[in-house]
Amino acid sequence: MLRKQTPGRARPADVEAVAAVSALGKVMNQDGTALDHSKVRKRESMLPTRGRSGRGGVRRASAESAGRRTRSEDGKAARSARERHMEDEFNAFGGRATAGVAKEVPARGGADDGPVMTTKYVPSPRGLVKVTVPVSAGSSAHSSLRKSASIHTGMNMRHGSGSRRASMTSAGSDAARRQAKSTAESSSARTRSNKPKPRPSGDSHSPSPTTRAPVTPRRTTVKDLVAPPLPEEPEDSVSTSGKGESIVPLNEKEEEQDEQPFDSEANARSSPKTPKQGGHVPALEVSQHGFQTPVPDGPTMAEYLQSADPILSAGATQRQRELEEAEAASTTPDGDRLKIGKSPSPMKSAMKNSPSAGTSKYNRPPLDTSSAADGAYLSLTTAENTRLNAQLSDDKMRKSPTLRQPKRRVSVHSPKTPSAASADRSSKVLRQFSLSKPQGRTLAMNKNNSGEKQAQSPTSPKSNQKKVDPSVLYPREPPKKKSSFERERPQHKNLGFKNLSLRSEASNEFMYQGTLEGEIHQSPGQHVGHETPKKALLSVTAEGWKSRFSDSDSENDSPPFSSNASGSTQPSSHRDSSLAHHGGFGLFKHKDHHGHKPKHSLGASLASAKPHEPQKARLAPTSNRGSNTLSAERPLKNHNSFSGKLKKLFGKKHAT
């Protein structure tokens, strides 16, 4: 049901619309000016039966079809009333016969007043121009026929009347061709004259649309170029008779323009204030009138344009004034000319400073060039220019013209040097030294290139580095540390604690080297000096100091001190005893007042064990006795200073 209702509701609107349009077309007469409303109503009354027969209304006698018919009839009545209103308004403006480009306007006074006139819109350089042209009865019939054919074209295609459509379109095309010819002639005449024709006194009440006006000349211009000229008809003669007054002077003016093409163009440019009006444009007449009285032996075109244009005339007067000044300058005496030629600044040319240098060269008479004064002037200016060019070519002048100032300062101070007092000699030497530096710089800049300057800059720090000893600048690198928990140690060092020693290797090697140097470089008469550290150590142990490494459980270690007096000659026993009892380092601090840092204990033990060695003996061994005797006095001072540092750190005096 739904599928059948949807197309059934859409069909009646299309069929009824087509039927209404066809009824309106058949009711209209040929001119399309009036409608017989009685015929329209009869046609509308016939439309429902035609619509019902078209869609099979006999078989559908249900309530839905009856309701659909009532709705369609109501809509059709409203639509017909709307269409009647639109047709009445359309006929009030002239109907379908006057809807094209050409529009027939009936004469007001009747048929006896004159021929039927028609208004046309013709394109011109200034836009569309409205023209009234007389039209014969045949052309009006053709135009009305063409309009009716354009109206009924859609209808004939639906009803299948192809032969009638072809005949009507052919007749309409003939009428269009004739009308196009007349419009093309009028448009070409207007483009040549560049002025519109005078409008007639009678105004038309029915305006025509301007949308179709540009379409007609486009089609006609192409046909005019291709088709041969057709023989003139009586209506064309009538139309040309109306145009006769404007065409005849046009040809005469064209001939005059061909005779003088350049003058008219120049005059058109030189007279910008040409009046532009819609009806009459007298531009060509004014231009021709201006050239009717030419001057036979007058100025040229350029001079004429200069006189016409105020800007060019002002420039010409200024140029004439400059020429007069140049002539006046060329007649000045030679003495004044030499004064003018002198240049205040050395960087400019002497020829450029004189105002008459450029103009007198061309405006000077030929007899004046052979005078002796001019030759002397030229020679002087040439010599001046040569001298200036030589200064510019100098490298010192081009690169750094301000570097000559220090030399002038030296020359100013030089006569004062012999008369200066002795108190000012030091300041004078400093001043001369400061002045000699820029002089050396100027010589280096003039002699050396930029590459040599860069080569000199890195050489200066190298010479300074050679003088300074690198051992002073950088400290000695300590030896590589080994793990203190190594079980296998080298036997040649003979360290006191071989099993898991917590002592650093660097301190052991340092102490070992110091003892070896002291024993090797000592003479045999100095054995008493070796026993002094043992006595010091015995005094320390007598006071109650004990090493935490000398334990009863240690089996490998030797007793702290042997009763042998010859222990001083054995470096191994002396070294073991000194390391075991006095040079120990611990991870844990003693809580008693005797415990102190390993650094200070090491320094104190070294200072007390070797009083005969200076601190410098650790780096370089001493070979002579004089140095040993002198160094024996120094450790006391070092010991006192070290104990003072301990007092400051701990606030207690340690017995050493």
Swiss-Prot record:
Residues 66-88, 477-491 have a biased composition (Basic and acidic residues). Residues 399-411, 588-600, 645-656 have a biased composition (Basic residues). One of its GO terms (cellular component) is plasma membrane. This is Eisosome protein SEG1. Residues 136-150, 182-191, 206-219 have a biased composition (Low complexity). It is a peripheral membrane protein. Component of eisosomes, large cytoplasmic protein assemblies that localize to specialized domains termed MCCs on the plasma membrane. It comes from Eremothecium gossypii (strain ATCC 10895 / CBS 109.51 / FGSC 9923 / NRRL Y-1056). Residues 253-262 have a biased composition (Acidic residues). It comes from the Eukaryota. Important for the stabilization of eisosomes, large cytoplasmic protein assemblies that localize to specialized domains on the plasma membrane to cluster specific proteins at sites of membrane invaginations. Residues 351-372, 433-463, 557-572, 621-631 have a biased composition (Polar residues). Residues 28-95, 135-375, 387-656 are annotated as: Disordered. It is found in: Cell membrane. Keywords: Cell membrane, Membrane. Belongs to the SEG1 family.
